[in-house]
């Protein structure tokens, strides 16, 4: 069962201002669409100012919805959100989709929008995509924010690896059995803890059902792509843009891998800064969008695209 083994190993890798209320028009208007070299991406742009591009994680297409409602971010920046291929209404290509492919889609979207340089924000596997773009096209990435990226930790021991594989095995058993809802729930519990569902249901009504519809994308395409992608220390040293590593304070209680990744980012990248969000787990920007928006805005202000 090579596929099952690969998926299990990859799961281990993944292991205040007043908020702005969106207008009725903003909440209900359809997303725009961009045709990019054979794929179509849904996207939305809010605000004006220096461009900020948000690259969402797997599972939920609308991870960033609460964040873009925050005036601290969209009141000061031109914020772009989009659905990656295989999620919601974006294209659903057959066959593998690599992290490099995803970075190419991101690059194409920026070109489509006339963005020459941006602050990139990647959550979980979205962080890997942002890093890939920074490696391939450093001129496009002014800063990179990594919100608990899905990085492989070279120092993880064999015993821990086996233990984490065993913990995730029921998730992949459920997926192979066709119980996509149980697979999605089990995976999210593994990376975010048991309280994630209440947070998601409150902030993103309907998101769990959409995640079940998108489950094939996540389990069949995204997880293998993340497993096959590697970041070496010498690669990280080439990324000289300012980096902000964001971690939820309660994430290490869910799995020690989150602290290991956070520390790895701070050690490997030449210009890395750290931010730990109190009372938060892997769903940190859904739990506390205002605090995350303020932290991002402060980081971007310290590193403006056009220095005064």
Language-model regions: role of each:
Residues 35-92, 109, 300:
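Conserved HGGG/HGGXW glycine-rich cap/lid loop of the alpha/beta-hydrolase fold
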Residues 64-66, 90-95, 155-157, 257:
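Conserved catalytic-core motifs of eukaryotic protein kinase domains, centered on the activation segment
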Residues 69-72, 234-280:
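Conserved loop-alpha-helix segment in the C-terminal half of the alpha/beta-hydrolase fold
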Residues 75, 80-121, 125, 294:
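Active-site loop/oxyanion-hole signature of alpha/beta-hydrolase fold enzymes
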Residues 153-207, 220-227:
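Helix-rich cap/lid subdomain of alpha/beta-hydrolase
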